[in-house]
Amino acid sequence: MQPLWLCWALWVLPLASPGAALTGEQLLGSLLRQLQLKEVPTLDRADMEELVIPTHVRAQYVALLQRSHGDRSRGKRFSQSFREVAGRFLALEASTHLLVFGMEQRLPPNSELVQAVLRLFQEPVPKAALHRHGRLSPRSARARVTVEWLRVRDDGSNRTSLIDSRLVSVHESGWKAFDVTEAVNFWQQLSRPRQPLLLQVSVQREHLGPLASGAHKLVRFASQGAPAGLGEPQLELHTLDLGDYGAQGDCDPEAPMTEGTRCCRQEMYIDLQGMKWAENWVLEPPGFLAYECVGTCRQPPEALAFKWPFLGPRQCIASETDSLPMIVSIKEGGRTRPQVVSLPNMRVQKCSCASDGALVPRRLQP
């Protein structure tokens, strides 16, 4: 079985390290990049005294402030626990099948999905069938199996998203595993009542040519109705109870921070008026609450580290952030004018326990 971890990505915020406190240098660097400047502009105090922020500029700034509280950047958290869901195989055509999984109440409340694994049982190819296809080279005796998530929209139209794809040999048999974590993440974003999880499995030839033209048709997967349920498609859901392994929310301001403090969000005020580089340049805001993630995270059992060898230790990170709208002064053609900019991922909204290597979920498109 090929490892499933190759498609997992490391999620990194523009902070020095996950959950680390935002510094003035990082804020300055983000602002320079947003304005495509190499250095802080030189502005005279006399120019600033005559500068008036127009109503439409301030309205744009306020609108960005309001929007930033609803449009957040999200990260992925780690988890553990195991559930198995049996699915139905509905044949669409010779090489394409639709898997249907009833998912309601399959994911425990207050839990985080770590990984979803689709297991399909590849049936042995009869020797007579292999003989009819003649002598197949190792390359021509392979087929590509692709798994897509199928979404049925309210208007009845369908949309598919590629989830996983791999090559299988027609000479092999047994269980094949596919990482379908992203499909379950998409399903979780659907509005209620949620439809079943629909996975479309396609078997296609890898190469063109007479030897490979029909080899992919030899790849068959066991369907519902197999003797005693053996070999029917399975969906494994690995989750972690956030009550034991998650963060606690905001830190208790009355409690002292210790090495054993559970991961939490701590207030941290960034005073822009006290930063020399912001003088005469940053008009709004005078400062802001950035927050930082502090504390430690409970580590999963050692057995889990064996299953996911490429995941590092769990740590307290910023899993949801907001942008920071600002009004800055820009000098063009001898005139100074105000301009609204928005710096992404500047304010921590939520802290979570996560592990390096966890999947970054994509947003579900309309």
From Swiss-Prot:
Glycans are attached at N158. It holds the Pfam family TGFb_propeptide. Residues 1-21 form the signal peptide. The processing of the protein may also occur at the second R-X-X-R site located at AA 132-135. Processing appears to be regulated in a cell-type specific manner. Its main location: secreted. One of its GO terms (cellular component) is extracellular space. GO terms for biological process: anterior/posterior axis specification; determination of left/right symmetry; heart morphogenesis; negative regulation of transcription by RNA polymerase II; transforming growth factor beta receptor signaling pathway. Keywords: Cytokine, Developmental protein, Disulfide bond, Glycoprotein, Growth factor, Secreted, Signal. GO terms for molecular function: cytokine activity; growth factor activity; transforming growth factor beta receptor binding. SUPFAM superfamilies: Cystine-knot cytokines. Disulfide bonds join C251-C264, C263-C316, C293-C351, C297-C353. SMART domains: TGFB. It is found in: Secreted. PROSITE patterns: TGF_BETA_1, TGF_BETA_2. Residues 22-76 form a propeptide. Required for left-right axis determination as a regulator of LEFTY2 and NODAL. Belongs to the TGF-beta family. This is Left-right determination factor 1. It comes from Homo sapiens. The lineage of its organism: Eukaryota, Metazoa, Chordata, Craniata, Vertebrata.
